[in-house]
Amino acid sequence: VSIGGRELERTTLRSRNGLADRITYATGEAVRNEYNPEEQLAAQYLITADGREEKLFENTYDSCGKIARHKDLCSGVTSTYQYDLIGRMVGTDRSDGMKLRKVYDEKNRVKGYTYQKDRVGHEVEFLYGDVEKQQKPGLGYGIKINGAQKIAYEYDALGRVIRTHNHFSDMNTSTQEYTYVSGKEAGVTTNLVASVREGNRAESYTYDACGNVETMVERSADGSERKIRYYYDALNQLVREDNQKQNQTICYTYDVGGNMVRRDEYRYTENPVITEAPRKSDTFKYQTGGWRDQLRFYNGQAITYDAMGNPLQYLGMQMEWEKGYQLRHITGAGLDMYCMYNDSGKRIRKTVNGVTTDFYLDGSAILMQTSSDGSRIDFFYDDKGNVFAMKYQNEMYFYRKNLFGDILGILDSHGTELVKYEYNSWGKLLNLTDYSSNGLGRRNPFRFKGYYYDEELGMYYLNSRYYDPETGRFVNADDVEVLKTTPTALTDKNLYSYCDNNPVGRKDGTGAVWETVFDVVSLGFSIAEVAANPYDPSAWAGVVGDAIDLIPIVTGVGEAVRALRFTDKMGNTLEIAEAVDFTKDARDIIKSLEHTNGFTKSTRSAGRKIHKGYKSGPAFKAEYKEYKKVKGIRPDY
């Protein structure tokens, strides 16, 4: 793979079987794979630029070809895995004492999980719709922690959330109520949220023709209102915001490659033409040849890069990298930080100025973190993978969020708000108010869009790379695996830009591909339903309906599917999703319905048509044979 005339990495394949033998990076480093006689990955080695070889991990497999034991030689932790009869992972035991167990329901959804370390653990249960209670069986209705329900959902006839009840304790509950934007025609509606109300506090939203957030009005408990208006260019890049909340107007200028070249801050105004000089300006200067998306100077501060496009000198800090894209060591400005990653590239440890924090993961979700200073924090997630609560020093705390997923506050079990956060549109922390007695505001790591914030570094860790809210860009380029997977969609992309310069209505929790904060979760749920039972045409109808809702925010099913490929939430749904993407009927249906804005009467018939086309293919037949063998049921045609 080459960018700007420079080859970033080269993969050498083994003869006969085509397995990846070695990946060599532009820095001279390489990763070498070792396979067992069954052609399963048995070990991996890191080869440094000077030729030294370090073994990273070892795998052993069970008789079904599943990894039974994984030994991480960097962290010294060995994990053993247990599976059920159809190959789903149901248990993990780690040599450091961490144990995880999972339970699935008849639709292949995670029904709940328990984990424990040092004899302290928690049980989380997801509540799905019960037909006998006149609930929709495909939707989540709540979450329990240690047997106590903490979240409950109510839906309208279209399956949209209209109320979320947060149970802080038996005696303290708050309720969020949602309304939705009407469609262009009578009787048509959308999945775009028009308002969110919680007690005497509310937010309302309007959108432009492309589905971008145009205005947000925040109504406080005292009845006062503060408005933010957003402006976008033809590429949906944020070019201006009139921010009454921050009492300023900000204008953004980009070059043709999607690089921000100037950011100007003015006194708050709603005038279309600004004649006064900016109160503050930030300037960005880029590489003039080769890889032109590389930021070389920010407000005069220099940035230098290695051959992979990773910064070596970054705004007063020195950075060291390994395995192509992994940030290993950062020094400067009183900071000395080391990071360690697992075989999937997820961070499992950081050591900052002598204090080590270990992360205990389920996929990319941090179930718990412990630090060498003796602290432990447990985190809890909803059925869509969004963090909603934490436990610290034996006390439960709950996050208050806005529609964008920004964590605005932390509440205790009495519903009292102890911490308040305020960010700019790009996630830079502007204000932190902490009324707690234990420094909760700084201790809590989840902030803007629900991302993990490294307080010491001033950046967000997005599961594969770091995002700097000061510059509004990723620190290093995206992994070129993204280009290999979706070359037609991403080869023209700026691999350093954050959410293609639309930070308001988009998020990128993986550091790979952005998604909209409003509707892609809904589409993802529908795809998961198809994966759980690909023989139910109503599940396919849901995919089509959600895809229609995304137009023109996301063009067709395929683009949304590409976004979901890089998340850990969808499990093994890639094959199903690709069937949607490449089914001719699906493309034709989506194209014919692009003029709509919301649900239509033809949605269900469209879903049935896609289902009919899919079930005639070889993928369906093979899958159904296995499904019938395991489940012993007939498909619903």
State each model region's role.
Residues A49-R52, E125, V131-K136, G183-T189, ...:
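Intrinsically disordered, low-complexity Ser/Thr- and acidic-rich flexible linkers and loops
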